[in-house]
Amino acid sequence: DGVAVSFKLSAFHTCFNVCNVLILIWFVHFIEKTVCKIIPQKEQEEEYRLQFITGGMLSTAELSILQARKEINLFAERIQRMFRMVRDLLHTENENDFNKLFSRVEKYENISDNMELEIANYLTQVSEGRLSSESKLQIRGMLREVTEIESIGDSCYNLARTINRKRRGNEDFTKAQYEHIAQMFQLTDNALTQMLDLVRDTHQQVDVNKSFNIETEINNYRNQLKNQNVIDVNEKKYDYQMGVHYMDIIAECEKLGDYVVNVVEAHRDVKEKKA
């Protein structure tokens, strides 16, 4: 009868759905990876927006300063991400992939400029309120941090442009040059990682010695490579122009390291004023 037919149909659909779930549940991760490859993710614009100071001033200056600190920390994280893109750019061989990554670095450079301006404007607004002398000194130090972090972004973009110029030429770096650049990039990334550890830590005493030690390593390595470059060019291990590109990268890393130390020193000053 009709009731029996309805019951059988319902039972069939229920069993069918249960079987589907039991079968497909084992392929969830595979399906996810397949869909992600077929449908490329859009670049997440929210990644590039300010996250902590978009709502304007808070009820007290101290809370506003705290929000600005969070934004500065996020700014520093994005700058390290930008540097790692540059590191990947050096070893990107496919022309289309290279152009996409270079464009992304350019985009990050523009974002860096905008973040510096917006955070600085916010801190300036905060400074116009009623503040203690200690809070005013904190803001001054934070403004310096923001300026130096933006300078790191400029250095990252300069590195990307040098890599792009080298790519447009007919020659390539030697194996030894690639190894030396990789070592310098690692030292630079270590400096950025140490900087992030310091700016994120709002409770402990800031020990800048490790940052200074890394900077000394970078300077010494730059000097060593600079001297060796003169010898290698004279011995015709590579031509003069490749030596120029090579040393531009090495020198820019050293300059980036200087900006990192400036951020660390500014943050130390902020912590001392706050203490």
Model-derived segments and their meaning:
Residues 1-12, 16-275:
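Cytosolic, long alpha-helical scaffolding segments
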